[in-house]
Swiss-Prot record:
Tissue specificity note: Expressed in flower buds and siliques.
PANTHER family, alphabetized: DNA-DIRECTED RNA POLYMERASE V SUBUNIT 5C, DNA-DIRECTED RNA POLYMERASES I, II, AND III SUBUNIT RPABC1
Species of origin: Arabidopsis thaliana (Mouse-ear cress)
Keywords for this protein: Nucleus
Protein name per UniProt: DNA-directed RNA polymerase V subunit 5C
Location in the cell: Nucleus
Domain of life: Eukaryota
Pfam family, one: RNA_pol_Rpb5_N
GO CC terms: RNA polymerase V complex
GO terms for biological process, alphabetical: DNA-templated transcription
A molecular function GO annotation: DNA-directed RNA polymerase activity
Primary location group: nucleus
Family per similarity comment: Belongs to the archaeal Rpo5/eukaryotic RPB5 RNA polymerase subunit family.
Described purpose of this protein according to its UniProt entry: DNA-dependent RNA polymerase catalyzes the transcription of DNA into RNA using the four ribonucleoside triphosphates as substrates. Component of RNA polymerase V involved in RNA-directed DNA methylation-dependent (RdDM) silencing of endogenous repeated sequences, including transposable elements.
């Protein structure tokens, strides 16, 4: 295994082929309604993303088929029924809420209404908004009034799980002790590591914060694995 601090692209544009041999086109072929298919794909990816972030996700949610989804939610799902609220495995008192927003433009008024609506939800420490419309600058600023981090994802970004791509490298998030051990081993400061920006799609998927470090392993036949580390900036 080759280990390096050198710069290596983590998120290059690659042809959309997945582990099961399908591509984006074959993944989305369907004779049913488009609206229910979009919600099904986005909600499934949201569950997978939460699981990968360390939240407790029921296996039944991950294995739900499109036909089963439609039998539960219908062809035109009610947005409130699509909401997800799951606890953190390491601290079940902490919960994250995923809210699917409507197609109307998101304004300060709608953000404030949501704030009031979820104010009695005990234990929330994070929230994700799945957007079907644009959010203006003032509405984005209003999100900072929440007592926890609020992330936003356009629904289009969740139609495919980017971590399932056949050419996607293995990503491991280092904890504080592992990060310190790495820096000592190579006599480095975190700012000297190659970096990934917070807006990077993989950083957003895992919900990583500034100064966190990830280990990235590329499988390169026939020479074996290639390892690099990145710091979030």
């Amino acid at each position: 295994m080759e280990e390096t601090m050198a710069e290596e692209g983590c998120c290059e544009n690659v042809e959309s082929t997945f582990d099961d041999g399908t591509n984006c086109i074959s993944k989305t072929e369907d004779t049913g309604g488009i609206e229910s298919k979009r919600f099904y794909l986005a909600r499934t990816t949201a569950f997978e993303m939460l699981r990968d972030r360390g939240y407790e996700v029921n296996e039944a949610e991950l294995s739900l088929t499109l036909s089963e989804f439609r039998s539960v939610f219908g062809e035109k799902p009610e947005l409130e029924r699509l909401r997800i609220c799951v606890p953190l495995r390491s601290d079940p008192k902490k919960k994250i809420l995923v809210v699917f927003m409507g197609t109307e433009p998101i304004t300060v008024k709608s953000v404030r209404a949501l704030h009031i609506q979820i104010s009695n939800n005990v234990g929330l420490h994070a929230m994700i908004l799945v957007l079907q419309s644009k959010m203006n600058h003032f509405a984005q600023k209003a999100l900072t009034t929440f007592p926890f981090t609020v992330e936003t994802f356009p629904i289009e970004d969740l139609l495919v799980n980017i971590t399932k791509h056949i050419q996607q490298p293995k990503i491991e998030i280092l904890n504080k002790e592992e990060k310190e051990q790495l820096l000592r081993k190579h006599a480095l400061e975190d700012k000297q590591l190659p970096y990934l920006q917070e807006k990077d799609s993989f950083v957003r998927y895992y919900g990583l914060k500034k100064k966190q470090v990830v280990k990235i392993t590329y499988s390169k036949e026939p020479v074996g694995d290639f390892v690099t580390y990145r710091c979030i900036i």
